[in-house]
Design a protein with these regions (language model features):
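Acidic, low-complexity central loop/insert segments
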Residues: 82-121, 125-130
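A short glycine-rich, His/Asp/Glu-containing loop-to-beta-strand
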Residues: 32-65, 158-201
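Hydrophobic, proline/glycine-rich low-complexity stretches
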Residues: 1-62, 66-71, 75-76, 275
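A short beta-strand-loop-beta hairpin characteristic of the jelly-roll/cupin
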Residues: 70-98, 206-231
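Double-stranded beta-helix
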Residues: 118-178, 183, 202-227, 254-276
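Conserved metal-binding segment of the jelly-roll/cupin
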Residues: 96-116, 228-249, 256-258
Length: 276
């Protein structure tokens, strides 16, 4: 597990492209047979990819977190973006087809990840945050989610928002997690943009062709910067930063949030004329 530290917005003004990518971009999440995680000190979110092939995989971070087992003091959200598989929680097995999700409550001792077909492995994207209470584990089938349709082709942002770990679906301590799918011909997400000083966010961009690139904009509204991402890369967005993007083709992204509240629409909107 890699550790990333928090940054003051004034510091980011001096960053080169290389420094910006080193601090906020995570490039290698899904590697066959591996668990690749990043621990950001921004609200202590842990996120990353678990890609089992022939062997099951689990997350062992007891020494790094100073606990007896990974979810002793944490909750966990999982969305599978790869082939079919199963997740086993303390002996109970959950089938995970592509884009299925799972909320795992604090106190779950054993979490095992499995792929049905090693040649088409499951790709489990995870978000984990500190938790103070145990809420029930909930399996979230994408077929059972009623997406929010928003945007418009005229503004290149027609999309559907699927809420997974969200008060409309299940209870959680502070974690929120969902998936946004852009329609063909649409490329903009979260524009007009916003910040939310009360919560941080992590974006995972995926379902992109090999030569498709996403342009993720971040920074204070009057001091914006950008990162260029390829398929299955993620970016850390501190609470003071905007988080919006466009791409050379349509794409899908997973958003994960944590912080002071779980109010999805608690945001500070930024007027277009305020962007620099």
């Amino acid at each position: 597990m890699e550790t990333r530290y928090a940054h003051h917005p004034e510091d980011m003004k001096t960053y080169t492209t290389h420094q910006l990518r080193k601090e906020f971009l995570v490039e290698s999440l899904f590697e066959a047979g591996k668990v690749n995680l990043t621990y950001t000190h921004v609200d202590r979110m842990i996120f990353g990819g678990v890609t089992p092939t022939e062997q099951e995989l689990t997350i062992q971070l007891d020494k790094q977190l100073g606990v007896s087992f990974f979810l002793e003091r944490r909750e966990l959200g999982i969305i599978n973006i790869g082939g079919a598989g199963t997740v086993t929680l303390d002996g109970e097995e959950f089938l995970m087809d592509k884009r299925d999700g799972l909320y795992v409550g604090k106190g779950t001792k054993e979490v095992w990840f499995h792929s049905k077909d090693p040649s088409n492995p499951a790709k489990y994207y995870i978000n984990s945050t500190p938790a103070h209470h145990t809420y029930p584990t909930v399996k979230i089938d994408i077929q059972n989610i009623d997406p929010i349709a928003t945007g418009d082709p005229s503004t290149l942002n027609e999309r559907k928002i699927y809420q997974y770990v969200h008060p409309n679906i299940c209870e959680s301590c502070q974690l929120q997690m969902g998936l946004t799918m852009l329609a063909p011909g649409s490329v903009w997400n979260t524009m007009p943009c916003h910040t939310h000083e009360r919560r941080m966010e992590v974006y995972l961009y995926f379902d992109m062709n090999e030569d498709t690139r996403a342009f993720h904009f971040m920074g204070k509204p009057d001091e914006t910067r950008h990162l260029i991402l390829k398929n299955e890369e993620a970016v850390i967005s501190p609470s003071w930063s905007i988080h919006t993007g466009t791409a050379t083709s349509n794409y899908t992204f997973i958003w994960g949030m944590c912080g002071e509240n779980i109010t999805y629409d608690d945001m500070d909107h930024v007027k277009m004329e305020e962007l620099r």
